[in-house]
């Protein structure tokens, strides 16, 4: 692995361990030439995906770009990094296991919106405003109206935020008990932490 600091080719692995969700191997490396330390991640890649942009242009799928987009939407929000990683990994797994070699940027955007909607309302609105190219205040009003209606209908239980995209229906244990609000599982999870 090339050193990102000096370009040296002979870096050494000092520590290897699985990531928290076991979807990657985290390796701490050191460069004997400059002494630089850095971290790399090794992940399974099921297939090469191509993203078809709105313009028709085709580019390779970039997991890091997906991560950055989600990070921008979640900037200054109190969402744990492992939940963000589960969201990114879940979207990536769903795309790779779809069986299709090409995926539209619109499909990726919809998956991100679905994931953010269950994770953080503010991040969902931020992402949607850019993704849907909002031009006027009424665009925000319509989205917020739908979001409020969905929450009143219980369409997006907060407990689903911990479930990766594409993981199937939530178990009964993840559903709020009778009389509990949709955020009760989150309160229980925080009290355990």
From Swiss-Prot:
- Segments forming unnamed zinc fingers: 3-34
The GO molecular function terms of this record are: ATP binding; DNA binding; zinc ion binding
Looking up InterPro entries in the UniProt record yields: ATP-cone_dom, NrdR-like_N, RNR_NrdR-like
- Annotated GO biological process: negative regulation of DNA-templated transcription
Every ATP-cone domain range: 49-139
Q: Cofactors per UniProt?
A: Zn(2+)
Under the heading Pfam families, the entry gives: ATP-cone, Zn_ribbon_NrdR
Q: Does the keyword Oxidoreductase apply?
A: no
The entry's keywords: ATP-binding, DNA-binding, Metal-binding, Nucleotide-binding, Repressor, Transcription, Transcription regulation, Zinc, Zinc-finger
* Region span, Disordered: 150-193
- Report the co-factor binding details: Binds 1 zinc ion.
What the entry lists under HAMAP family is as follows: NrdR
Q: What does this protein do?
A: Negatively regulates transcription of bacterial ribonucleotide reductase nrd genes and operons by binding to NrdR-boxes.
Query: Which family is this sequence assigned to?
Result: Belongs to the NrdR family.
User: What name is this protein filed under?
Assistant: Transcriptional repressor NrdR
What species is given as this protein's source? Answer: Methylobacterium nodulans (strain LMG 21967 / CNCM I-2342 / ORS 2060)
């Amino acid at each position: 692995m090339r050193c990102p600091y000096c370009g040296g080719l002979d870096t050494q692995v000092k520590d290897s361990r699985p990531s928290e969700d076991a979807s990657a191997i985290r390796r701490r490396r050191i460069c004997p030439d400059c002494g630089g330390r850095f971290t790399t991640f090794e992940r399974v890649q099921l297939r090469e995906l191509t993203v078809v942009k709105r313009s028709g242009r085709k580019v390779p799928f970039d997991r890091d770009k997906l991560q950055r987009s989600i990070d921008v939407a979640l900037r200054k929000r109190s969402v744990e990094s492992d939940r963000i990683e589960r969201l990114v990994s879940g979207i990536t797994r769903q795309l790779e296991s779809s069986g299709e070699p090409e995926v539209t940027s619109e499909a990726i955007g919809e998956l991100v919106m679905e994931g953010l909607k269950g994770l953080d309302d503010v991040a969902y609105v931020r992402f949607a405003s850019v993704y849907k190219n909002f031009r006027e205040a009424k665009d925000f009003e319509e989205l917020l109206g739908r979001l409020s209606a969905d929450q009143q209908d219980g369409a997006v239980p907060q407990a689903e935020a911990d479930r990766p995209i594409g993981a199937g229906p939530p178990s009964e244990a993840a559903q709020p008990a009778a009389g509990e609000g949709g955020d009760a599982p989150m309160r229980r999870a925080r009290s355990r932490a």
